[in-house]
Amino acid sequence: MFFDTIAAISTPLGTGGVSVIRVSGNNSIAEINKIFKGKDLTKTKTHTITHGFILNKNQTILDEVLISVFKTPNSFTGENVVEINAHGGILITQMVLERVLSLDIRLAFPGEFSQRAYLNGKMDLIQAESIMDLIHATNENAIKIAHSGLQKYTSQLVTSLRDQILNLIAQIEVNIDYPEYDDIPQITQQKIALEVKSLIKQLENILNHSHKNRYLKEGIKTLIVGRPNVGKSSLLNAFLNETKAIVSDISGTTRDFVEAYFNCQGITLHLIDTAGIRKTDDPIEKIGILRTEKMLLQAELILLVLDQNNHLQEEDIQLLQLTKNHPRIIIGNKADLKSDKLISSLSNNSSQLAPQEIISVSSLDKTGFLELQQTILKKFQLNDIQPKDFNYFSNARHINQIQIALRSFQDLQQALLQSMPIDIYSIDLTKAYQALGQIIGDNQENSLIKELFSKFCLGK
C-alpha cells in the first residue's frame, strides 16, 4: 500500500486538443479539490466527469477543465484516481501540472501508475508488460498479441501449468511424509513420468507458438546476400517499390548495410541489403564483407540471390556452403531475361543445388514476388494464422522462463530414467514452478519489478 500521491502528464507532450494529467493516491481527490472551482469532487460518484476550473494560487483561473474521478478500488491503480482533462498546449499543460505538484503531490516515476496497479493486484505482470507492448506496437499483429496478454489468455496458460505442477508436488510430498496411510493414493514413478511427459508436451507447444508470435510482433530479420552484381539492391528496391539502395553495373557499389522494412502479407520483414561477398583488395569493401559475414550469424532468414543470366560462379558456391546451415531461401534473380544459364550449370558443379530449390524472380517486373512472399511465410509457419495463435507469448523474458521450466522437466525425465529416489523429483518440479511464477510476477524480486516498470513512459 502506498501513502503518497503522485501525478504526471499521461498524454504525449505537444500541441493538441486535450492533454491529461493523471493523479493517483488515496488523497488525490481531496488534494485536487483544493485547486478546483466547480462541484465538490469529494462528493462526486466514482466514474463521473465534472466540469470546472483549475485555479492559480491567487484564485484566478488557470484553465477550464473536465475532471474524471475514479474511486478505490475500481480504478486503474486500485487507488483514488483523478484525471484532469486540460487544454492541449505544451505551456498550459505544464502549468497545470506544476499547480498540481504545488500540493501534497509528487511527480510520478516512469511506469509508477502501472507499478501501483500491479502491486495493488489490479493486474499481473503479463498484463502490465502487455500495456507497454500495446503502446509500442508497430503492426496489427503486435496489437492482437498485446490484447491477448491484457485479457489474461497467456496468464491462464501459466496458471494452468503451475496448478498441474503444484498438484504433482503435493502428491509426492504426501507420499513421502505419510507413507503409512492406506487411504492416500500412491504416486508411482510411472505416473510421475506420464505427468512430466504431458507437461513437456504442453511447454513445447507453447514455445513453438511463442516463437511464431515473436515473428508476428517483431518481424523477421532478413539478410539479402550474394556475390556482387547479382541484383541484391534491385531486389530490395523491388520489395519497397522505391530506390532505397544504389543500383550500378559497377561491382562493389554496396559497401555497408542498407536497411528497410517491408510488410509481407501482414508480417514485417526487416530487410538488410549487404555488401557483395567476393575476394577484393579494396580495404573499405573488405570491411563491408566482414560485417556481412558476421551478420549471417544474427539473421533469422537469409535471401541468397543468384543470377539466372549467368552460370554458377565459384563465389556462389562458397555462399551456398556458407549459408547451408542457416534458414535460407535461394532466389534466382533476373527472370525477365529468360536465361537458363544458371539452371543448366547446376548439374556441372559441386553445390548439390536442385533447380526446384530456386525461386525465380524478376526485380524489374516483379515476376515471382508473390511466390517468394508465400515461401517466406510458409517457412516460418506464418501462412495460416488463426485468432487463437495470438494467445501465446512473444516477450523474450517470458519465453526464457518457459525454456527454464522445460529444461527442469527434461532434467526430471533423466532422473526418472535413472530411478532416483522420489524426493529428488520435487527439486526440478519446484524449479519449473518458480520459473513460471516469474512470468506472472509471483514472488518477483523488487529489483526486477523496478527494472521492468522503469521502461514505461511517464504517466503510465
UniProtKB/Swiss-Prot annotation:
<feature type="binding site">
    <location>
        <position position="254"/>
    </location>
    <ligand>
        <name>Mg(2+)</name>
    </ligand>
</feature>
<keyword id="KW-0547">Nucleotide-binding</keyword>
<dbReference type="Pfam" id="PF01926">
    <property type="entry name" value="MMR_HSR1"/>
</dbReference>
<dbReference type="GO" id="GO:0005829">
    <property type="term" value="C:cytosol"/>
</dbReference>
<dbReference type="InterPro" id="IPR031168">
    <property type="entry name" value="G_TrmE"/>
</dbReference>
<dbReference type="InterPro" id="IPR006073">
    <property type="entry name" value="GTP-bd"/>
</dbReference>
<comment type="function">
    <text>Exhibits a very high intrinsic GTPase hydrolysis rate. Involved in the addition of a carboxymethylaminomethyl (cmnm) group at the wobble position (U34) of certain tRNAs, forming tRNA-cmnm(5)s(2)U34.</text>
</comment>
<protein>
    <recommendedName>
        <fullName>tRNA modification GTPase MnmE</fullName>
        <ecNumber>3.6.-.-</ecNumber>
    </recommendedName>
</protein>
<dbReference type="Pfam" id="PF12631">
    <property type="entry name" value="MnmE_helical"/>
</dbReference>
<comment type="subunit">
    <text>Homodimer. Heterotetramer of two MnmE and two MnmG subunits.</text>
</comment>
<dbReference type="InterPro" id="IPR027266">
    <property type="entry name" value="TrmE/GcvT_dom1"/>
</dbReference>
<dbReference type="InterPro" id="IPR004520">
    <property type="entry name" value="GTPase_MnmE"/>
</dbReference>
<dbReference type="InterPro" id="IPR025867">
    <property type="entry name" value="MnmE_helical"/>
</dbReference>
<dbReference type="InterPro" id="IPR027417">
    <property type="entry name" value="P-loop_NTPase"/>
</dbReference>
<feature type="binding site">
    <location>
        <begin position="273"/>
        <end position="276"/>
    </location>
    <ligand>
        <name>GTP</name>
    </ligand>
</feature>
<dbReference type="GO" id="GO:0030488">
    <property type="term" value="P:tRNA methylation"/>
</dbReference>
<feature type="binding site">
    <location>
        <position position="248"/>
    </location>
    <ligand>
        <name>K(+)</name>
    </ligand>
</feature>
<keyword id="KW-0378">Hydrolase</keyword>
<dbReference type="InterPro" id="IPR018948">
    <property type="entry name" value="GTP-bd_TrmE_N"/>
</dbReference>
<feature type="binding site">
    <location>
        <begin position="229"/>
        <end position="234"/>
    </location>
    <ligand>
        <name>GTP</name>
    </ligand>
</feature>
<dbReference type="GO" id="GO:0003924">
    <property type="term" value="F:GTPase activity"/>
</dbReference>
<feature type="binding site">
    <location>
        <begin position="248"/>
        <end position="254"/>
    </location>
    <ligand>
        <name>GTP</name>
    </ligand>
</feature>
<comment type="similarity">
    <text>Belongs to the TRAFAC class TrmE-Era-EngA-EngB-Septin-like GTPase superfamily. TrmE GTPase family.</text>
</comment>
<feature type="binding site">
    <location>
        <position position="122"/>
    </location>
    <ligand>
        <name>(6S)-5-formyl-5,6,7,8-tetrahydrofolate</name>
    </ligand>
</feature>
<dbReference type="Pfam" id="PF10396">
    <property type="entry name" value="TrmE_N"/>
</dbReference>
<feature type="binding site">
    <location>
        <position position="460"/>
    </location>
    <ligand>
        <name>(6S)-5-formyl-5,6,7,8-tetrahydrofolate</name>
    </ligand>
</feature>
<feature type="binding site">
    <location>
        <begin position="333"/>
        <end position="336"/>
    </location>
    <ligand>
        <name>GTP</name>
    </ligand>
</feature>
<dbReference type="GO" id="GO:0005525">
    <property type="term" value="F:GTP binding"/>
</dbReference>
<keyword id="KW-0342">GTP-binding</keyword>
<feature type="binding site">
    <location>
        <position position="253"/>
    </location>
    <ligand>
        <name>K(+)</name>
    </ligand>
</feature>
<feature type="binding site">
    <location>
        <position position="83"/>
    </location>
    <ligand>
        <name>(6S)-5-formyl-5,6,7,8-tetrahydrofolate</name>
    </ligand>
</feature>
<dbReference type="GO" id="GO:0046872">
    <property type="term" value="F:metal ion binding"/>
</dbReference>
<keyword id="KW-0963">Cytoplasm</keyword>
<feature type="binding site">
    <location>
        <position position="229"/>
    </location>
    <ligand>
        <name>K(+)</name>
    </ligand>
</feature>
<dbReference type="InterPro" id="IPR005225">
    <property type="entry name" value="Small_GTP-bd"/>
</dbReference>
<keyword id="KW-0630">Potassium</keyword>
<dbReference type="GO" id="GO:0002098">
    <property type="term" value="P:tRNA wobble uridine modification"/>
</dbReference>
<feature type="binding site">
    <location>
        <position position="233"/>
    </location>
    <ligand>
        <name>Mg(2+)</name>
    </ligand>
</feature>
<keyword id="KW-0819">tRNA processing</keyword>
<keyword id="KW-0460">Magnesium</keyword>
<feature type="domain" description="TrmE-type G">
    <location>
        <begin position="219"/>
        <end position="381"/>
    </location>
</feature>
<feature type="binding site">
    <location>
        <position position="250"/>
    </location>
    <ligand>
        <name>K(+)</name>
    </ligand>
</feature>
